[in-house]
Amino acid sequence: MRVIILAFALLLTTASVLSSATDPYLQKRQEMVRDDIRGRGIKDGRVLDAMAKIPRHLFVGERLRRQAYADTPLPIGEGQTISQPYVVALMTEALRLKPGDRVLEIGTGSGYQAAVLAEMVKDVYSIEIRKDLAETADKRLKELGYKNVAVKYGDGYLGWPEYAPFDAVIITASVNHIPPPLLKQLKEGGRLILPLGSTLFYQTLTLVTKKKGGDLAVEQMGAVAFVPMTGEAQKR
């Protein structure tokens, strides 16, 4: 473990020498990863590398950029938020992603979670029910060079059957049940993570693994607070 930590520290030091002149938020990003992500128990090196690389400040409004690397959610408009960095890392690590995976994200929001996924897997398919957010996130991701992310304006409850099955599904809005269409689009052996429970207060971060024959293994990971899933989810 000591070798891994030293190597990671060296990577950040090298990045600082090469990029500090062009990235005024580099030091804050390094501190975020060191203190709020690795410091709180995230061990997956690929998650750490992705979040050390991605300019989170470009996924929030200009007036919030100084706060972009604080371990807190921030508003992005239309009553939505960019998730707390630690929660992004926790959910991503729990999926145990592999480089060749194809991942479905429900709730594109700012596009930050999609960018983290895109650094780690082959393809990301992300659905956003709010048109303005979908278009803004799609434009931002393209400008940052992410060619392996497809953003769709639509109701994420229904998934994206044309590209199913998926190795993993991540839901970034609270819902009081596991959407059946998303379970159907999850590969056998695949993992789905979501904030499950009341859409008014706190939810339980829940990891679901689809076993052979469609059986589900469910693991509860602690309390979280997410904005509610809208659209079809509210009718159920």
Curated annotation (Swiss-Prot):
Protein name in the entry: Protein-L-isoaspartate O-methyltransferase 3
Claim: Cytoplasm is one of the keywords in the record: yes
E.C. designation(s): 2.1.1.77
SUPFAM superfamilies, per the entry: S-adenosyl-L-methionine-dependent methyltransferases
Known role: Catalyzes the methyl esterification of L-isoaspartyl residues in peptides and proteins that result from spontaneous decomposition of normal L-aspartyl and L-asparaginyl residues. It plays a role in the repair and/or degradation of damaged proteins.
Reactions it catalyzes: [protein]-L-isoaspartate + S-adenosyl-L-methionine = [protein]-L-isoaspartate alpha-methyl ester + S-adenosyl-L-homocysteine
Domain of life: Bacteria
Family matches, as Pfam families: PCMT
Active-site residue list: S83
Compartment list: Cytoplasm
NCBIfam families with a match to the protein in the record: pimt, PRK00312.1
Organism the protein comes from: Geotalea uraniireducens (strain Rf4)
Keyword field: Cytoplasm, Methyltransferase, S-adenosyl-L-methionine, Transferase
Gene giving rise to this polypeptide: pcm3
GO molecular function: protein-L-isoaspartate (D-aspartate) O-methyltransferase activity
HAMAP family: PIMT
